[in-house]
Each structure stands twice: as C-alpha cells, then as structure tokens.
Amino acid sequence: MADTITPREEDYSQWYIDLVRSAKLADYSDVRGCMVIRPNGYAIWEKMQAALDGMFKATGHVNAYFPLFIPESYIQKEADHIEGFAPECAVVTHGGGEELAEKLYVRPTSETVIWASYKKWIQSYRDLPLLINQWANVVRWEMRTRLFLRTSEFLWQEGHTAHATPEEAQDEVLRMINVYKTFAEEYMAMPVLIGRKTDSEKFAGADETWCIEAMMQDKKALQAGTSHNLGQNFAKAFDCQFQSKNGTLEYVWATSWGVSTRLIGALIMAHSDDRGLVLPPKLASRQVVIVPILRGDKQAVAEKAHALADELNSNGIHAFVDDSEQNSPGWKFAEYELQGIPVRLEIGPRDISSNICIAARRDTGEKQQIALDDTFAASISSLLDAIQQSMFKSALEFREANTREVSSYDEFKKCIDKGFLIAHWDGREETEAKIKEETKATIRLIPEDPDFRKKYSMDEPGICICSGNPSKGKVVFAKAY
C-alpha cells in the first residue's frame, strides 16, 4: 500500500524504488544487475510496444530478429564501436563443455551482426531503402543498477536502416526521432526536447546522434530515445556496397535508432506521486476500475457494476470490476491509486436510484458525477482524454518553470540542481569534460526546435560560462539519469 512508499521530498531515489516494488512493476533478480519485470510492469511495456510498432509500420518499417550472440570478429570490425562498448560487454568463451574457437559477445546492440546480413541482402539500388526494426533484449554490464533505468539486461527495440544517399539517411534519422517525440508526448504525456548530442556524447560509431530529453520530477534529465546517423562507417566495415543507378559501386548510408524499457522508469518519474503510480490513460492496460459499494441489495449493485464495465469495454475502454468482499472500499481505493488506474468509478444503491455514479481521477483526485444514461461511455471517454491532456500540460508547465538561462559559472553551480540550464558553451570537449567533472552536469542536447531556440536566443553569440572563450550559441545542461 501507499504507506510503504517513502515520500518524494524525503528521499526521491527511495520513493522510486518503493513505488516500483509496491505497485508490483518489477523486482530484483538473484542474477546481479538484472530485474524481473512483473505483469503490471510488462503490461505497460506491451502498451508501449503496440503503439510504437504501429508507428514504425506506418513509416514503412518491418520487423525481423537477429542472433543474440555476435562473433568477436564482427565486433572488432568497427573500431569506434568496440571502443565504446567493450567495457559493458558480456562475453561467452565456452559452449557445449568446450572452449569456443571464437568468443561470442552477448548483444549490447546489434549493428555489427545486422550489417553482416545486410551485406548479403543489398546488391543494387533496387534493394534500398532497407527499413528493419527488431524487438529484443540486450546486455550491457552495469556496475550501478536501478530498476528500469539501468540494468545489465533490458528490453528494447532497435531500428537499422540502409539508404542509397546521405540525404535519405538523414531524413530517416529525423523522421524516427520525431516518431519518438510524438510517442513521448501523445502517449506518455511527457514533454521532450529534441536535438543533437555533442560529439563526446554521441553513439559509438555514429557520425551524429539525435535524442529526446525529458525532465523528471526531481528536475534531472532523462534521455528517452536516440536516433543515429551512422554515415558509411558500418557499410565500409562490412564492405556493404550496392550498384547505383549509374552502374557504379557505392557504400550504403546507415541509421539506427532505439528506445527501451527505460521509458517505464521515465513514465513513473514524470507523473507519479506519494500515493503510487499515475498512468496516462493511453498506456494503462486497465483504464477504469469500478468499485461497487455493496450495501442493501448487493446483487443488484454488483450486476449494475458489471453491466457498466461491459458497456465501457464494448466501447474500447478497458474497464473491470472489483466486487470482492474480503477488502473494504477504502482499501480498494488506495490499492488502485497505487496501481495508477486512471479512473475509479464508485457506485452504490443510492447512486443506482439516482442514475449516477461517482468518478474519481487518479491524476488530480477530483471527483465528479457521471450520468448512467446513453451518454455514459462517451462521458468516460471524454474524461480519459481530459486526463491525458491534463497530465501533459502539467508536465510541460513543470519543465518550463524549471528551465532557466544562466550567464556565469557561479550561477550555473548554484542552479544546476534546479532543472535545465541554458548556457553558452565554447564547443570544446575539454570544457565539456571540466563542467561534468566539477558539477556532474552534462550537455543534454543542442536543441533544434525553432520555437525553443527563439525563446532562449540559442543562436546568439556570447562567452562560454566555464572557459570564458567565445561561444557561437547556447546548449542545454542538466544532471541526468
């Protein structure tokens, strides 16, 4: 129950862990660094998968599956890639009771094993573009783990595409990062900034990385999705060439992009409260719980509750009834608040005689009467839409209230725990590294949204807050997960 959850103001990190476990979203595994995703948590992932998969297919992508094990020779073909991932890799050295002739890496990401296949499949410009997505698990050996946010094994999707021209590849990079932005904002009700990573923060082996960044309730940033322009790096490493329309042999241009179960952690930290989980209706596998107040003619009340649930379900709203008698209505109210059910309906004998029920919103706690007539399902649908929009609006207002410009390093240090900081940077990696070492803050992105850039005069020349060197523009700094 909610009384087992540490208040956010007391200990935000403990609040998060308490909530994840109390709401039965995930639990620790006996395997160090790994987690068990429980049914409540996996139901959220299934909703995310369904929405994203539809968006991928609407943009022309298809699903496939590639091996979990990657030969060491594949990994070594792209030097920057292996340098970036080597410390995180799990390596298989024995199989079938014998030492393997070649080590096998447990998939940290699939570029290398996928490009070994693409080399076989791509011969001509007619084979392009190749637009493939994979739903899979990956392993990156983590020393400090946190449920959903950072674990040694996690679930994700990874898109890998091949193109005939650099322009087509760049269009794909931007298309997919905008798909992620749309998903985050329209499904997760979580506003995000969109932009490019600095060279030191980009994906290992990429020419350029684009990302979306969200602000959590503790004012830290969370990277919620990435899209990488891989140039011709992997094509050259795997000698993947195609015959162009002009008859010449050319290397293909590549992208990759992905999101993971980390989004569940983001969803929790963006919206939830001290009573438990708060879910946007579009990602709630159970959107409405009906709690009958079993007094008087209990059977009539229970039957009405089930009839209402049937009506909602037939209208595409996922509803269920809890008419068990071993727990009180008050216990049920608290339990379903903990689980984040967006709407609770209360109905008793007097409500039936008045032809109404009481609807309670999980996000605000507000209650209202709903008429039990032919407008009932439409009223609940409108309420769910209002909750979805209200959650996004609230999160956006929170981010805007905690985003500020700073003009000096002293001010930067004082404000870095207060949200997103907009500040001048001289473009040098050594300056970026110094700021990170001294403040634990990183450049989250170079934002590309025109309205955001205009609001904060991002292109205005100035002086770097740290080095005092000339700066061509501003970037977004924050502490991050």
UniProtKB/Swiss-Prot annotation:
It catalyses: tRNA(Pro) + L-proline + ATP = L-prolyl-tRNA(Pro) + AMP + diphosphate. Signal peptide: none annotated. Consists of three domains: the N-terminal catalytic domain, the anticodon-binding domain and the C-terminal extension. It comes from Chlorobium phaeobacteroides (strain BS1). HAMAP family: Pro_tRNA_synth_type3 (MF_01571). CDD domains: ProRS_anticodon_zinc, ProRS_core_arch_euk. This is Proline--tRNA ligase. It comes from the Bacteria. InterPro entries: aa-tRNA-synt_IIb, aa-tRNA-synth_II, aa-tRNA-synth_II/BPL/LPL, Anticodon-bd, Anticodon-bd_dom_sf, Pro-tRNA-ligase_IIa, Pro-tRNA-ligase_IIa_arc-type, Pro-tRNA_ligase_II_C.
